[in-house]
């Protein structure tokens, strides 16, 4: 049985993809394709695989987690599944950690090496979606405020914009942790709101027709953020005037973030040093120009803390 991981990144349409997979789980199962999403992985399946500081010493929770995963994989094979797709962006880290460190998934290598051991060489493919950095960070910071974070200070924003860590570094760490896996990079700008295309071109599987076009868990707008701040007694005037998407960066910072992303994409187009494959939708002549209707914001309500249980639905 092949195991395929869909690992985000956060803020790239993961909730929409997971909803699509959940709604079509029956026809996929009939075709020998199983699906595990956050509703399963965050209810104890992965607990202990990545250690937390508060865990008592001497308890080998990692080995227990590996055994638990292996039991579930054995059960999936016994049901006749040929492929298992697992989608959970918290495997690579959390938005909370990204905001705290001002960096993109600084622990992705260590985390994914633990998942590699848990799946014992059964991983065939990893699907990863980057997003233009100024939009990624704007979305992440907006959702952070909605989940209790303070509005970031200028020094924090400047540090994020000046960070040298881009998606190239994230993908390099991922490839080092999973040297045997086929890493397929599918940019948000091309595949946003098109989960069936992501499944077909990322996993190489025949995808059920998606009759319900939805864009789930959008990031909060400026108006939403003002209400959030007012509800907790904070001053909403720290945010700029307007009703649409919040962009906290200066024009110079936006330019720096766009330049880093352009360098990342150039590296991917050049072959990514053999570490990953940039998957491009041949039905589109120009990526990133046609997106689903509605605000270009995306999010997952429980992505900031991987200890939370995914909402049903």
Which residues does each PLM region occupy?
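Anion-recognition interface
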Residues: 1-313
